[in-house]
Amino acid sequence: MKKQPGSFLFDGKAKTIFTTDKPYELLVHFKNDATAFNALKHAELEGKGKLNCQISASLFQLLEKEGVPTHFLGVQDETWMLVQKVDVIPLEIVVRNIACGSLCKETPLERGEKLSSPLLDFYYKDDQLGDPLLTDARLNLLGLTTSGQRLEIQSIAFKVNNILKNFFQKIDLLLVDFKLEMGLNNAGELLVADEISPDSCRLWDQRSDDPEQRILDKDRFRQDLGGVVEAYGEILKRIQGNP
């Protein structure tokens, strides 16, 4: 039975969250908003919310099938997702396979350079601070996780990377990097939360050699390349098995 949204809880950059009739379940509405540079750049793109909801649902189900616990419970309709309520750890967990984005600004690595092994970075989730990169010492100082939780986060993040990288490879998409969020449910279990979509993953089309055309993620919006919704639609089409 389709649940009706209860009280409004939170309005984020791309999603709005509501209570349900159960205390440990929430409804997430995926919006058409596109943002970049900590929301300094903003636009509404018709159809984006529907695509991100469907892509995220498919990828959450893939992870669940492979034994990775997520907050996903089901899809209510094209833009609404039912999820477990979690206490989100205020960390952006970024896994990188290919040098791109901030990594190229902070190191001598060239854009597109394959990393010798996946790199895991933690960023403090705070727009006012600019989501700063955290060292192990700073993570310990802030006390955002226990050492045991951090090891579990690392294990889950690398497992997710292997699953997604292999899956995307089969549909001619290169997983450059991606961002995860995780949180604890009422039973204290660590779950992958938020969303997994072209808003949070860099995906390059291996069917194209053109450095701009191959971009099928939010970098199209960041770099004013256009065709954002069309690129997201191409990803969903391939995920659903339509070459």
UniProtKB/Swiss-Prot annotation:
Enzyme Commission (EC) number: 6.3.2.6
Pathway membership, UniProt: Purine metabolism; IMP biosynthesis via de novo pathway; 5-amino-1-(5-phospho-D-ribosyl)imidazole-4-carboxamide from 5-amino-1-(5-phospho-D-ribosyl)imidazole-4-carboxylate: step 1/2
Superkingdom assignment: Bacteria
Catalyzed reactions: 5-amino-1-(5-phospho-D-ribosyl)imidazole-4-carboxylate + L-aspartate + ATP = (2S)-2-[5-amino-1-(5-phospho-beta-D-ribosyl)imidazole-4-carboxamido]succinate + ADP + phosphate + 2 H(+)
Annotated keywords: ATP-binding, Ligase, Nucleotide-binding, Purine biosynthesis
EC top class, as a word: ligase
PANTHER family documented for this protein: MULTIFUNCTIONAL PROTEIN ADE2, SI:DKEY-6E2.2
Family statement drawn from the similarity comment of this UniProt entry: Belongs to the SAICAR synthetase family.
Record Pfam families: SAICAR_synt (PF01259)
Disulfide bonds: none
Protein name as annotated: Phosphoribosylaminoimidazole-succinocarboxamide synthase
InterPro entries: SAICAR_synt/ADE2_N, SAICAR_synt_PurC, SAICAR_synth, SAICAR_synthetase
GO molecular function annotation: ATP binding; phosphoribosylaminoimidazolesuccinocarboxamide synthase activity
Gene: purC
